[in-house]
UniProtKB/Swiss-Prot annotation:
PROSITE patterns xref list: RIBOSOMAL_L19
Keyword Ribonucleoprotein: yes
Keyword GTP-binding: no
Protein name, per record: Large ribosomal subunit protein bL19
Cysteine pairs bridged by disulfides in the record: none
Keyword terms, alphabetized: Ribonucleoprotein, Ribosomal protein
Physiological role: This protein is located at the 30S-50S ribosomal subunit interface and may play a role in the structure and function of the aminoacyl-tRNA binding site.
GO biological process terms on file: translation
Annotated family: Belongs to the bacterial ribosomal protein bL19 family.
Leader sequence segment: none
Length: 120
């Protein structure tokens, strides 16, 4: 029975999403239904948590909107998530950045991860 479930889950897993992790600034395009219309809505913020559980994987994105912190949890393999783009790579030492909830302004900034140059 579990082999059938594994096969069905492998069919639904998305491979078109980029590699990202906590600390990265993401732009998530979400499909929104309003009556008969369907449109895309961008949600841009910092990824504060990532949960890897196969088809049940999810990630949490936090942004500040009009001075108020807004967090949204997205299912990684959901058909409602149209696309995810990484705007900026963050250099953090934690897997879960829940401490950002208590910080405001410049204290909530995250260092940018610099690319290593290949030596010639």
């Amino acid at each position: 029975m579990s082999k059938i479930i594994d096969i069905l889950e492998k069919e639904q897993i998305r491979t078109d999403l980029p590699e990202f992790g906590p600390g990265d600034t993401l732009v998530v395009q979400v499909k929104i239904r309003e009556g008969n219309n369907e449109r895309l809505q961008a949600f841009e913020g910092i990824c504060i948590a990532k949960r890897n559980r196969g088809i049940g994987s999810s990630f949490t994105v936090r942004k500040i909107s009009h001075g108020e912190g807004v967090e949204r949890v997205f299912q990684t393999h959901s058909p409602l998530v149209s696309s995810v783009t990484v705007k900026r790579r963050g250099d953090v030492r934690r897997a879960k950045l829940y401490y950002l909830r208590a910080l405001q302004g410049k204290a909530a900034r995250i260092k940018e991860k610099l690319e290593k140059k290949a030596s010639v």
